[in-house]
Regions:
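Catalytic cores of processing enzymes, dominated by hydrolases/peptidases
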Residues: 192-272, 276
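Polybasic, low-complexity intrinsically disordered segments
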Residues: 11, 19-36
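Ala/Thr-enriched low-complexity intrinsically disordered regions
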Residues: 9-10, 38, 42-52
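Intrinsic low-complexity, disordered N-terminal segments enriched in polar/charged/small residues
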Residues: 3-5, 31-32
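N-terminal short beta-loop-beta anion/metal-coordinating cradle
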Residues: 53-157
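Flexible, glycine/proline-enriched loop segments at strand-loop-helix junctions
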Residues: 79-83, 154-164, 214-222, 252-256
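Internal, conserved structured core segments that host functional sites
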Residues: 150, 157-208, 231
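A conserved C-terminal secondary-structure "cap"
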Residues: 253-349
Length: 349
């Protein structure tokens, strides 16, 4: 009996055997945990059906013939959750999907990425009779907008709870099959910005030249990041240019929707794609949203005073930017040289 108990105990504490068969990929690195067990990577888990297709769509990202043939492709991506204040970014992706009638390609909904106690599946009524269970996922679709000379891939889904590097590798594997050469990531954050002014849009670019092209100021932020920042880093590391746009949503009205921020992000998409993005009734929704928030804030003297202080601070920053923008750099340098000459010993004697 003692021997049997000891055998059971030994089996319980014995380390699991290591995986020995791994698919190699020049793009992916293999990570191991502290016990030496190999962590899952996208290339090693293809056979585990990490990607679940839409009906009548692609069955495996490894089968090139099952993907649509796209060229000069650009990705527009957004992630729900921490990266999506007021649902501004995800609403922008849903708008693009609707107006351009995007065709679905694949859906990544593997439970290796999601904690269902944090991001729970949702039950929806269908025709008032049957019910549909919707799992947290990442949906990937494509389209060719009218007047565009390139294909657009839309990536929209829920920020994963775990295995972010594997998740990004999965998205990059799909991007590689679709001949993606540029990635645009949309996000939204809560900020000290008034709802009565244009929505500030900041961002992160892959090079100083791209930052200048898209009018992005150099960011000095250091701190936690979400899957949007991780995915951008993964894209750049794999050789795909990627830029992220962040719309600032007033923190005192953080509940979705935030149509004004959504419009601001779509304007940025227009700049990158160099085509007009139909906004439908979004501008009208943005006006109604601003009026409703104004009415709400004016009912509370303390909040109204706070909003006014944000307006004054923002206007002062804009005025200073305009002043600095009018300064002639060459004239300023010449004046500085004259100042230095005046400071030299013996000047004017």
């Amino acid at each position: 009996m003692v021997v049997r108990d000891n055998q059971i105990a030994a089996e319980r504490i014995s380390p699991r055997p290591r995986r020995r068969r791994l698919l190699k990929s020049p793009r992916l690195r293999i990570h191991r945990d502290k016990h030496g067990r190999t962590l899952e990577i996208a290339a090693a888990l293809r056979a585990a059906t990490l990607i679940t297709p839409y009906p009548n769509c692609v069955t495996s990202p490894d089968v090139s013939s099952s993907f649509p043939e796209l060229h000069n492709t650009i990705v527009v991506a957004a992630f729900e959750g921490w990266n999506d204040a007021g649902d501004a970014a995800s609403d922008a992706l849903e708008h693009l999907d609707a107006i351009w009638e995007a065709d679905p390609i694949v859906e990544i909904d593997d439970e290796a990425y999601y904690d269902y106690q944090v991001n729970r599946p949702v039950i929806r009524q269908v025709d008032g009779v049957t019910r549909e269970l919707v799992w947290p996922s990442m949906r990937i679709s494509y389209c060719r907008p009218p007047g565009a000379d390139r294909d657009i891939v839309l990536m929209h889904g829920v920020e994963p709870n775990m295995r972010w590097r594997t998740f990004c590798a999965e998205l990059l594997a799909v991007a590689d099959k679709l001949n993606v050469d540029t990635v645009v990531i949309l996000g939204a954050l809560l900020a000290d910005t008034p709802h009565t002014r244009p929505v500030p849009v900041s961002g992160a670019a892959y090079s100083p030249e791209s930052a200048e092209r898209f009018g992005l100021q150099e960011t000095r932020y250091e701190g936690p990041t979400g899957i949007a920042g991780v995915f951008q880093d993964a894209c750049v590391a794999s050789g795909i240019p990627a830029v992220t746009f962040w719309a600032a949503v007033p923190h005192y009205v953080s509940q979705p929707p935030s149509p004004k921020a959504t419009v601001a992000l779509l304007r940025r998409v227009e700049e990158v794609l160099d085509i007009e993005v139909p906004l439908a009734d979004l501008p009208a929704q943005a006006e109604e949203w601003e009026l409703a928030v104004t009415e709400m804030t004016t009912d509370d003297d303390e909040i109204a005073e706070y909003v006014q202080s944000l307006e004054q601070r923002g206007d002062a920053e804009v005025d200073m930017t305009e002043v600095l923008g009018k300064i002639d750099g060459d004239a300023l340098a010449a004046e500085f040289e004259r100042y230095l000459r005046r400071r030299r010993p013996g000047f004017g004697r």
